[in-house]
């Protein structure tokens, strides 16, 4: 290998945050999503789209091993992060979840003060810096500081739904992850709150890699740089369906010039 090709290979590797290699995830004996090859680019927003039941949320949760908490859920294949297989026996799943944070569909603040919602995760992860500065910085990055700065001792549950979701984003940021996963983070929010979350995501990608699952195709167009479209097919002798990756490309290509007919049908609203 020449130095030029070696440098190019290293540069390519540095641009990939997460690499999913032939990933199949099953619940019991039934596969939920199969044979996925997918590389998530560093410093970009990647959207997973597709009809209900195609396995996109299951796949998202596999990136930080949240599926480990589901009895009977197994993964075959490899999920690489910084060149390390996250499912290797030597890997600590707690550390995985610190470095790859998660924001859920429903806002779920802790029953603690706004300040403690942000500080708690950092504290239990051994943060020894200035906690006040970390809390303020995290709330600012999540675009909720101005709404919270004068009531940091109030309960996080006293905030509006949109504010709670941005608080949850701040809580995730405070643990200093490298990747943030978002599972339909705006589905329970009103349009104004959704817009604020989307604006926040544009700022966050300057510091974090983001992967978002969304049923809202317009949202995928607005916020993402790259999009993966998943579909599902029936399985012989089974009542359910199994998801699979149809097409993965930059977002403009997926929505304006898709390579697969199924992608064209989905983004044009013919099914979903």
From Swiss-Prot:
Membrane topology (UniProt): Peripheral membrane protein
The protein's Enzyme Commission number: 7.3.2.1
Catalytic reaction equation(s): phosphate(out) + ATP + H2O = ADP + 2 phosphate(in) + H(+)
ABC transporter domain location: 18-257
Binding residue positions for ATP: 50-57
Gene Ontology annotations for the cellular component aspect, listed alphabetically: plasma membrane
Residue runs in coiled coils: none
Family, similarity comment: Belongs to the ABC transporter superfamily. Phosphate importer (TC 3.A.1.7) family.
Name of this chain's protein: Phosphate import ATP-binding protein PstB
């Amino acid at each position: 290998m020449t130095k030029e090709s070696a440098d190019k290979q290293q540069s390519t590797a540095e641009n990939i945050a997460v690499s999913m290699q032939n990933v199949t995830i099953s619940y019991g004996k039934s596969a939920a999503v199969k044979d996925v090859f997918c590389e998530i680019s560093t410093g970009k927003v990647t959207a997973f789209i597709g009809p209900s039941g195609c396995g996109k949320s299951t796949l998202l949760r596999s990136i930080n091993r949240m599926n480990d908490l589901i009895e009977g859920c197994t993964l075959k294949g490899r999920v690489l992060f910084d060149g390390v297989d996250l499912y290797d026996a030597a890997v600590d799943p707690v550390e995985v979840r610190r470095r790859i944070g998660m924001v859920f569909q429903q806002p779920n603040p802790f029953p603690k003060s706004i300040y403690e919602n942000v500080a708690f995760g950092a504290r239990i992860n051994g943060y020894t810096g200035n906690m006040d500065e970390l809390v303020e910085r995290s709330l600012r990055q999540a675009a909720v500081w101005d709404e919270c700065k004068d009531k940091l001792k109030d309960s996080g549950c006293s905030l509006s739904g949109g504010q709670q979701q941005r608080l949850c984003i701040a809580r995730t940021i405070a643990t200093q992850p490298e990747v943030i996963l978002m599972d339909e983070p705006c589905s329970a929010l009103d349009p104004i709150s959704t817009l604020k979350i989307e604006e926040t995501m544009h700022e966050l990608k300057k510091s974090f890699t983001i992967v978002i699952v969304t049923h809202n195709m317009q949202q995928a167009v607005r916020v993402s740089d790259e999009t993966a479209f998943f579909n599902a097919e029936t399985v012989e002798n089974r009542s359910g369906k199994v998801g699979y990756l149809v097409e993965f490309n930059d977002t403009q290509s997926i929505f304006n010039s898709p390579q697969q007919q199924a992608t064209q049908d989905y983004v044009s609203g013919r099914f979903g």
